[in-house]
Amino acid sequence: YPGKNLGGMGDGGLVTTNDDGLAATVRQLRAYGESKKYHHVMKGTNARLDTMQAAILGVKLPRLEASNAMRRKNAHAYDAGLKGIPNVVAPKVPADDRSHIYHLYVIRTTKREELQHFLHEKGIQSGIHYPIPIHRQPAYAELASSASRLPVTDGTADQILSLPMFPELTQAQ
């Protein structure tokens, strides 16, 4: 997906593993379940990365860590700017050795619509990613009975707002 931290010009994906069996299964699944040419041992799909995508991603991969560092810098600027603002909760980052890469910078606010309108008036784009929780989707109707047991999920879905996040975002923006 082009908007991801390591996005090509279309859809594509990557699986990394140190499990040889899992790697073999993934290779089969991406090629219609083939174990060898014309021998399909499982149901799969056509999920091979084409050479154009591979070439683009090959150029972008060496720059990924620098790009993620720029995203982290922008996130820290957001953190500082949003600190102490009532009704705004910034993303929480683990205090251990893990490092957030900020594909999105999603805040929570009980005044989402007002804030989104304010940002729009200032020419600042924002987005609401995943506004309908999975247990509220028709495809997962069997989960509907558990809806009353997911108040945090429902509340969060009504409060999330994604602020602009990309490596080239400047402090002035």
Please describe what each predicted stretch is.
Residues P2-G8, T16, S162, F166:
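Active-site phosphate-binding strand-loop segment of PLP-dependent enzymes
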Residues K4, G13, R30-G33:
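Short, well-ordered alpha-helical segments in soluble proteins
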Residues G8-G12, L57:
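Adenylate-forming
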Residues Y1-M9, K36-V41:
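Conserved active-site segment immediately N-terminal to the catalytic lysine
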Residues N18-Q173:
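PLP-dependent aminotransferase class I/II
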